[in-house]
Amino acid sequence: ELAPLDSMIFAEMLEEAGCPAGVFNLVNGDGIGVGSQLTSHPDVDMVSFTGSTRAGALISHNAADDFKRVGLELGGKGANIIFADADEKAVKRGVRHCFNNTGQSCNAPTRMLVERSVYDQAVAIAKETAISTNTDIASKSGKHLGPVVSQLQFDKIQVLIQAGIDENATLVA
């Protein structure tokens, strides 16, 4: 809805590869306007959706009347778990994975659970990795962390960070 270019490129790739018309259909738009219309339309036989649990529940509800097939991938953010015998690069890889796609990926880990005996070492590695990550505009090539998609998303992230701090999480950088 806010960043449809990658989906449009994927659709073009499928067409160029010879995918038959109608096998894959891309409809861009917001969930309330386009999503509700699409998921409740009688000519739509199946809906595949990746996104929030709230939106997935609405899709399931809309699709139930017609017994549509529904595939949902919802709220998949999880934790990195670091045990004492973990590879010494595990923390660094975990932090970098968290930053993939500016952290706006459904499989980006949102926290790190660390065994007590290696906690201080893990915090130091996580902090150094985060601090050494370059930031720049999204259109610039190279390895760096770009901006989030909107001010609304930025504000949501700030609320989530504060919620973690309020629940005694440690913000390391």
Show which residues each predicted segment covers.
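Glycine-/small-residue-rich active-site loops that bind phosphorylated ligands and cofactors
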Residues: L2-A3, L26, V114
